[in-house]
């Protein structure tokens, strides 16, 4: 296994259900060695309370909060959270993304200096004709 680790960057606003699902997929399928950096953009759905609970039990989590009342937006959060990440390798990971087994190994295997690596999935159309 590579000794390199990834900082997963996860900004969110009122996506608690998906954020829990996404976090659990990272920890279940990739373990606890990777950092997750969360940003809460003035949520009112319990996101901040949940993030505080996760932070207490997971040492590789950082949490940041916009107390509002104005939202900062996803572009601000990606920039801010990248600055807070402690690893050289960062992965933008939306709150509704799921980490499949070996995602980290595949990303790190393909990564070369100066290159950008992306992962995606293809979904069937929601409304096929």
For each feature predicted by the language model, list its residue ranges:
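Short, acidic, metal-binding catalytic loop of nucleotide-sugar glycosyltransferases
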Residues: 24-33
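Conserved donor nucleotide-binding strand/loop of the catalytic core
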Residues: 52-72
């Amino acid at each position: 296994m590579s000794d390199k680790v990834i900082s997963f960057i996860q900004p969110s606003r009122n996506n608690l259900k998906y954020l829990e699902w996404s976090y659990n997929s990272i920890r279940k399928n990739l373990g606890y060695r990777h950092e997750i950096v969360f940003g809460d953009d003035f949520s009112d759905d319990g996101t901040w309370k949940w993030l505080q609970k996760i932070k207490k039990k997971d040492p590789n989590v950082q949490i940041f909060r916009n107390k509002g009342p104005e939202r900062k937006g996803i572009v601000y959060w990606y920039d801010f959270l990248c600055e807070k990440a402690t690893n050289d390798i960062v992965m933008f990971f939306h709150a509704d993304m799921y980490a499949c087994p070996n995602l980290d190994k595949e990303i790190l295997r393909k990564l070369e200096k100066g290159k950008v690596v992306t992962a995606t999935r293809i979904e069937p159309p929601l409304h096929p004709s």
